[in-house]
Amino acid sequence: MQRSLVGSEMCIRDRVETDIEVDPEAELAGVYRHVGAGGTVMRPTKIDGPAMIFNNIKNHKDARVVIGLLASRERVARLMGCKKEELGKLLCRAALNPIEPVVSEEKAPCQEVIHKVTDPDFDLFKLFPAPTNTPMDAGPYITMGMCYATHPDTGCSDVTIHRMCIQSKDELSIFLQPGSRHIGVMAERATELGQPLPISISIGVDPAIEVGSCFEPPTTPLGYNELSIAGAIRKTPVVLAPCVSIKENAIANAEYVIEGEIQPGIRVVEDQNTHTGYAMPEFPGYNGLASHECWLIKVKAVTHRKNPIMQTVIGPSEEHVNLAGIPTEASIYNMLEKALPGKVTNVYAHQSGGGKYMAVLQCRKTVHTDEGKQRQAALLAFSAFPELKHVILVDEDVDIFDTRDVLWAMNTRFQGDRDIITIPGVRCHPLDPSSDPVYSQSISDKGISCKTIFDCTVPFELKDKFARAKFMDIDEEKWKDFI
């Protein structure tokens, strides 16, 4: 599916391609930083830049790499078939109306070429043009791998994205933050049973799968298969194929599939080959620290299409913002529609928070008893997405997707002594470098934060005094060449 999308008209109009040889070790990411990374990447970088295909990868003559396919919200919307302002609502509807995946016994496109670990020349370093994002990375990373596994007790399956570093010719490290992702729960249970957890890692799939896989509880609790969200978006089930070396399924249309087993009770140091102290750049814009508690995947086989396309993402890029942020919007909107129907008209997980730390809520006040519900909505948003740190509340006449308009509301409809609500001592996200006891005495542990609400809405009784200047409605057809 991804291969057809990469070559489609909807993507090709903002895609660049090069035959210049590129080194996957830091150079590839360094080039795309300028071409279109955006997000929380240090400036200069291009916002809403094109996707980029590298056709000539050093030491990987038969492979190509695509990056930035989802680095523009406008492009994501085209790929999903909706307006960019409606992406969160589309994902919300899909999560509420799932279509479960199906398993096909037909020959899968992802298995055109098969490499087994028993082959004498099997080597992950040679099979994958996996990039390192910076010279400080722990090694080459699989950053767009759809990790698929099944709970050993319940038989329920799950798909999630995790960072995975190639550690040897047949080993990957996988970072599973304790208690935060379903595959981590599955691996812990398999360890209790003293058995490995079979896992497939599909790379280069339909963007609907990639975005859908980034949902988190409580919207998608343990037992909810996020592949069903992609099925709902496409109105047809995601097709799976049985793996060739393990008892698990993989996404049939993937470009690459890694088949392996998470080893019970084994932990490895993420930067064991480089000793830099760092893993890779993460979504907040800083280098993530290397973990000393990564789980180990022993790889059994790699399958791929002929002339495969490797897909990758830069951790702090706009692509990651969209992957994380659109499901965040959907989760928040879903909860608010249930608790306060019609009182929040849209949600934007702002790029400056990496799609996780900050949300802008567009609020509707129609009667005087709506006053205060906007702050209730903010509290509910924190419950819908626990990693959220800041919520900005604005009125219906503010474009939440335009930062300048949001800051206009903050400058003209906000007073710091009455419109800031702080909630200290709440668990948030460990990758926020300011959520550390050395930063603030109010923080008792790494990952604890002060959640903050910025209420930039007009008090209901003052609405008439805050009406924006109205301009004359014009004949848009008459002036269509200019507007």
Where are these regions (language model features)?
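Single conserved hydrophobic/aromatic residue that forms the stacking wall/gate
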Residues: 1-7, 12
